[in-house]
Amino acid sequence: MLYDAIIMSVKVISVVDDMFFASKIRAVAEAVGKEMSFPRSLEAVVSKARETKPGLIVVDLHNQRIDPVVLARELKSNEDLRDIRLLGFFSHVQTDLKTSALSAGFDEVIPRSVFARDLQEILTAD
């Protein structure tokens, strides 16, 4: 699983427009000393990734502002950004989102419930 991989950077980008999950991610990140950013457009995510070189980008595959498939293709086609780990989470009943995300270049896609349960472990894996 992704969170078994080495995530050395203290910087994480979160592409989440659900206020509940954004709040939960922010609280856990602060508790474990991770620097979080929450860009709200495709251009802002790419720009922030170039600027900060995060160890991880977490993406809500149900995001209404940013198409996760387009985001993954953009990041993975860029030589400077392709090594950033992409973790997507989704409603377990929408397996088509999982398939699309993995095909687009996500490193791992997990159900939303697993993401919520394992968030601290995901952010502190090393």
Residue ranges, per PLM feature:
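A short, hydrophobic beta-strand element within the central beta-sheet of small alpha/beta folds
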Residues: 83-92
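Alpha4 helix (beta4-alpha4-beta5 surface) of REC/receiver domains from two-component response regulators
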Residues: 93-108
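Conserved phosphotransfer microenvironments
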Residues: 59-75
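Short hydrophobic/Thr-rich beta-strand motif most characteristic of the beta2 strand and flanking loop
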Residues: 33-40
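Output/docking surface of receiver
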Residues: 105-117
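Conserved acidic segment of CheY-like receiver
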Residues: 10-19
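Conserved phosphotransfer cores of two-component systems
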Residues: 76-81
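Acidic, metal-coordinating helix/loop segments flanking the phosphotransfer/catalytic sites
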Residues: 41-56
